[in-house]
Amino acid sequence: MALKSGLQLYTYKLTGTIATPTAYDLFNYVRDESVDMDRTEVDASSRASVTFRQFVPGLSNGNVETQIMHLPGDTIFDAIQNAFFNNTILLMAFVDGPLQAGDERHGETGTISVSGLWGAFYVTNFTEQRALEDAQVHDIRFSPTLEPVTNAVPEYKTVSVTL
């Protein structure tokens, strides 16, 4: 296993379902990206706790925060923009390797394991940044939801890919 930089990670918009995607569309115009894998804490304290509060894990977050280049006319940019303004869902995969031959950027070959967060997401932030000395970008937040066809929840999974 080798360490990877953010440059070696991949963001895909999927068609089909999470279980059986029919198309993987690689989105190369991503800058920084963070996958928030945290949980709420549920207070389970009682008088039996005596001195310390007791907590159990609650719901996972699963938000993905990213910056994308402002590229009207790009099919994935347009899909993200439309999902925000129309309150529609996108199927996405935020993974550590290519999901199909032809998407390799860093010398990946043979059969590889690819891991990451897969799921259905609403776009809940589409803030346009207009810095004087930087490229025009949008701050995006993908917020997890149930997949409309199967009611599947987002999942962190590993798949085997032959390139």
Where are these regions (language model features)?
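A short, polar/proline- and glycine-enriched secondary-structure boundary/capping micro-motif
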Residues: T22-F27, F77, I89, R105, ...
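Short intrinsically disordered coil segments
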Residues: Q81-N86, V137-R141, E155-L163
